[in-house]
Amino acid sequence: MPTATPATAPVTTTDVLIVGAGPVGLFAAFQAGVLGLKCELIDVLDRAGGQCTELYPEKPIYDIPAVPGCLAQDLVDRLLEQCAPFDFPMHFGQRAESVAEIPAPAASAGHAGHERLLVTTDGGKRFDVAAVLICAGAGAFAPQRVSLPEAAALEGRHVHYAVRDVSHFAGKRVIVAGGGDSALDWALALRKVAARVTLLHRREGFRAADGTVAEMRRAVAEGEMDFVVGMLGALRTEGADGGLSEVEVRTRDGSTVLPAEELVALYGLVSEPGPIAQWDLDMRAGRILVDTTTYESSRRGIFAAGDIAFYPNKQKLILSGFHEAALALRKAYHYAFPEKALVHVHTSNNAALKEKLTHA
């Protein structure tokens, strides 16, 4: 459960906070820079890319204008390269928890008289912004957890959904459960430090890169690690601290017991609206209803773009999200600079911008 952010935590002041660093969020950052807006990005994941990076990095994408075809991860890499000249701060492992209006008299220096928003995250960060652009895809991602009732008490100690510190597994018997790239990558990596690593998957086939699967099978054949086909059946503990000692595995032939002190379950991610669902926004089936002239939500200064935005005839396409973000930021500009008119200038005719983009 996230801890409360102290009211005295430092506050970062910027024009726009972008929630979500997937393709739409990254393009939004680029557009913010083009418009002359300062922005910062937050994402609950530990790196940029959203679903494209975490769920299907090798999925081919064919419907991006002027890009006949590319892999999902390649698209993310290109978007990162595109917005790099603006060098916007990105804060990973941060989930937006709450948003509150800052009364005009209490607004930060330089913005007195204009209502702004204070966004807090579960990681202790606070942002004073003119606008929030939510590009969180289908919502915040969370790991798919082990469904066994005894797993909850072991989470963070002996049951893990990510590898934060490899040294924690040194000299221990480790089971890595899952059949995707992350599961195989970490099983191969941990075999170098653990006493023994067993990869556990419900079937012989994998949802991973062919080269990674081949490397895993070679490591198993040469006795560097083990592979078991089966599913988690029970977690057994021992000792005063109730540490994990064995894992019961259901197999085709019945069951078997594997010694284990650590379990790394990498079953993929599931999406959930998260705290944004409590932000007093008009929502439809977990998505944010927006005005299609500005992509602003029912709450002033909060915008949505990408899969999380809802409106009639909405198309869940990355290119649609690009369009939505571009229009949202033009309205956000007026909140950031209410005294200034936004004059449209083609990037090719803006000498300063052209210099930044071509000589970054």
Swiss-Prot record:
Keywords: FAD, Flavoprotein, NADP, Oxidoreductase. Pfam families: Pyr_redox_2. It is an enzyme of class 1 (oxidoreductase). FAD binds at residues 43, 51, 56, 96, 141, 307, 348. Its cofactor is FAD. Binds 1 FAD per subunit. Transmembrane segments: none annotated. It comes from the Bacteria. Its EC number is 1.18.1.2. One of its GO terms (molecular function) is NADP binding. It catalyses: 2 reduced [2Fe-2S]-[ferredoxin] + NADP(+) + H(+) = 2 oxidized [2Fe-2S]-[ferredoxin] + NADPH. InterPro entries: FAD/NAD-bd_sf, FAD/NAD-binding_dom, Fd--NADP_Rdtase_type_2, Ferredoxin-NADP_redctase_2. Homodimer. Belongs to the ferredoxin--NADP reductase type 2 family. This is Ferredoxin--NADP reductase 1. It comes from Cupriavidus taiwanensis (strain DSM 17343 / BCRC 17206 / CCUG 44338 / CIP 107171 / LMG 19424 / R1).
